[in-house]
């Protein structure tokens, strides 16, 4: 029997048809929707008089455009309101479950699906959103798709795909104090580059991965896309099973036992072939922070911004120079000496309960600078309630933060939470692109 990687096992088990050129029709187990990338797909279904093939394997939420100040679809502008109204109508017409703003469990799509047990090992999962790779933390093959592909999955519950190469990234060493999963994935991206994963599905493994929580694993897989990868994967284990036990959509009873038997098969075989293998030791890692305008322009908190004149690659040199100009920074200076205007704690990368606990622990009995505007946006209604039960909201408010409603918020400039021109923000989100948090905004 041929040895296989985790990616190959999941892919092969979902092939409906494969032609001689290696292009496949893959069955999709779970299709997640939100208000921004789905309207045109539903319009196309109506124009062709087609139905949704598997409405029970499709779930929708409002997250990108929602206001985190007021529980109203009118609070983020006319375009946002129109998109949310359209999502309500589409889900009603096609019988799709919707977590709208009046649902107590509404939140970011990549937060609510795992916390409700929709995301399970061995699944194929798609969504019209780049950071669908988050779900790979459960040993699911998960990736973002475009609007035309959203239509295709709605209509057929399948998707045309090709096989990607497979990369193994092994993380070893003891996690230093104050280093988080976000630091680890930023370090990986910084070491390998923002295009290092192009054409690959990446499996993260090693002692470090084995010993971190599911929420930390989600952070790592969430940002696999920032390496250019199709998806990120982590093999399921006892930590995964414990997290999924008794979730609303998780299997139960005899089905749970049968699922466990299958999930234990979901790991790369000992002699499985990877197209590329990389090992990184994080024993001496310090907290990481980006200085530029893409995630691989990253340094340790105690390092200086690199001198772009010393960069050999002309392309990287010009990119670094441009980034410094946009960010209003100079080479050979410390970011710890740079003043910030805003702080954002949230996004599908870092808005879960463990993230809020970690941040509140630092903020307890402290006050933020008077000139800094700071917000905390829980990833879901469930996370918000849990945090409030633990009194975390009071810690944030007492320190000077605003405690908001769930949503994507300041991760992207699609709602009212955005930077003003020239403002500098320390953000727990996943992208530091130019204008990502608002025109002229500077994101770290």
UniProtKB/Swiss-Prot annotation:
One of its GO terms (molecular function) is metal ion binding. It is an enzyme of class 4 (lyase). Its cofactor is [4Fe-4S] cluster. Binds 1 [4Fe-4S] cluster per subunit. Gene3D superfamilies: Aconitase, domain 3. It catalyses: (2R,3S)-3-isopropylmalate = (2S)-2-isopropylmalate. PROSITE patterns: ACONITASE_1, ACONITASE_2. SUPFAM superfamilies: Aconitase iron-sulfur domain. GO terms for biological process: L-leucine biosynthetic process. [4Fe-4S] cluster binds at residues 348, 408, 411. Its EC number is 4.2.1.33. Pathway: Amino-acid biosynthesis; L-leucine biosynthesis; L-leucine from 3-methyl-2-oxobutanoate: step 2/4. Catalyzes the isomerization between 2-isopropylmalate and 3-isopropylmalate, via the formation of 2-isopropylmaleate. Heterodimer of LeuC and LeuD. This is 3-isopropylmalate dehydratase large subunit. The lineage of its organism: Bacteria, Pseudomonadati, Pseudomonadota, Gammaproteobacteria, Enterobacterales.
């Amino acid at each position: 029997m041929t040895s296989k990687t985790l990616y190959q096992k999941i892919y092969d088990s979902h092939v409906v048809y494969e032609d001689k050129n290696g292009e496949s029709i893959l069955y999709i187990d779970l299709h997640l929707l939100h208000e921004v990338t789905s309207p045109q797909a539903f319009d196309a279904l109506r124009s062709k008089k087609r139905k949704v093939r598997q409405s029970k394997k499709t779930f929708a939420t409002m997250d990108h455009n929602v206001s985190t100040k007021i529980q109203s679809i009118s609070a983020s502008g006319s375009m946002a309101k129109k998109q949310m109204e359209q999502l309500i109508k589409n889900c009603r017409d096609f019988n799709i479950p919707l977590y709208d703003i009046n649902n107590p469990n509404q939140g970011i799509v990549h937060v609510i699906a795992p916390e409700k047990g929709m995301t399970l090992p061995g699944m194929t999962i798609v969504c019209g959103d780049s950071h669908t790779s988050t779900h790979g933390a459960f040993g699911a093959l998960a990736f973002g798709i475009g609007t035309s592909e959203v239509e295709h999955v709605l209509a057929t519950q399948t998707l045309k795909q090709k096989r990607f190469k497979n990369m193994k990234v092994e993380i070893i060493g003891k996690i230093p104090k104050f280093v988080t999963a976000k630091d680890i994935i930023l370090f990986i991206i910084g070491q390998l580059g923002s295009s290092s994963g192009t054409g690959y599905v990446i499996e993260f493994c090693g002692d470090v991965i084995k010993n971190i929580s599911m929420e930390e694993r989600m952070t790592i897989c969430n940002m696999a896309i920032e390496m250019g990868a199709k998806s990120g994967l982590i093999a399921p284990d006892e930590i995964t099973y414990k997290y999924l036990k008794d979730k609303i959509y998780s299997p139960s009873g005899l089905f749970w036992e049968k699922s466990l038997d299958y999930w234990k098969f979901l790991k790369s075989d000992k002699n499985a072939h990877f197209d590329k293998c990389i090992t990184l030791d994080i024993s001496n890692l310090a907290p990481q922070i980006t200085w530029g305008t893409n995630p691989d322009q990253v340094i340790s908190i105690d390092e200086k911004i690199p001198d772009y004149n010393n960069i050999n690659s002309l392309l990287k040199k010009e990119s670094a120079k441009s980034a410094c100009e946009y960010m209003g920074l100079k080479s050979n200076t410390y970011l710890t000496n740079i003043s910030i205007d805003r702080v954002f704690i949230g996004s599908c990368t870092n808005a879960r309960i463990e993230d809020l606990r970690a941040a509140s622990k630092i903020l307890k009995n402290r006050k933020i600078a008077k000139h800094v505007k700071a917000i905390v946006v829980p990833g879901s209604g469930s996370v918000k309630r849990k945090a409030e039960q633990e009194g975390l909201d009071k810690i944030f408010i007492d320190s000077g933060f605003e405690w908001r409603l769930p949503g994507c918020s300041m991760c992207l400039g699609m709602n009212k939470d955005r930077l003003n021109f020239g403002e500098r923000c320390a953000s727990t989100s996943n992208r530091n692109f130019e204008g990502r948090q608002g025109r002229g905004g500077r994101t770290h």
